[in-house]
């Protein structure tokens, strides 16, 4: 019986100058996705993917490393300028933005897109430790 060849999707080298860096910073993790202006993903990374586990994922240093890795992925496609959208209340917001600048990307704009409820769902009860 002949085995069917498995086709894998090859990464295309896009030549993109401008893009958007989406930083989602929660209390437990930081996820950085860099897309082109249409929304197609060029590169992404998270604190967990970089190698941090447990409570270390929520640190600013983990966010810095994740942003660095995502920027390196995106710069292989020729990315130079980036607009930053930040979502969430986590500790890695500023560290991730600084890391994008240090990696060699020019930050044009920083926008906070944290969703704020107009008195929607009831929040979880307060923790008593």
Swiss-Prot record:
Task: Report the record's Gene Ontology biological process terms.
Answer: translation
UniProt feature coiled coil, ranges: none
Q: Which GO terms describe its molecular function?
A: rRNA binding; structural constituent of ribosome
Q: What keywords appear on the UniProt entry?
A: Ribonucleoprotein, Ribosomal protein, RNA-binding, rRNA-binding
Question: Is Ribosomal protein among this UniProt entry's keywords?
Answer: yes
Does the entry feature the keyword Ribosomal protein, yes or no?
A: yes
What NCBIfam families does the database record attribute to this sequence?
Answer: PRK05309.1, uS11_bact
Record HAMAP family: Ribosomal_uS11 (MF_01310)
Report the sequence similarity comment from the record: Belongs to the universal ribosomal protein uS11 family.
Q: What does this protein do?
A: Located on the platform of the 30S subunit, it bridges several disparate RNA helices of the 16S rRNA. Forms part of the Shine-Dalgarno cleft in the 70S ribosome.
Which protein are we looking at? Small ribosomal subunit protein uS11
Please report the organism this UniProt entry assigns to the protein.
Desulforamulus reducens (strain ATCC BAA-1160 / DSM 100696 / MI-1)
Q: What is the lineage of its organism?
A: Bacteria, Bacillati, Bacillota, Clostridia, Eubacteriales
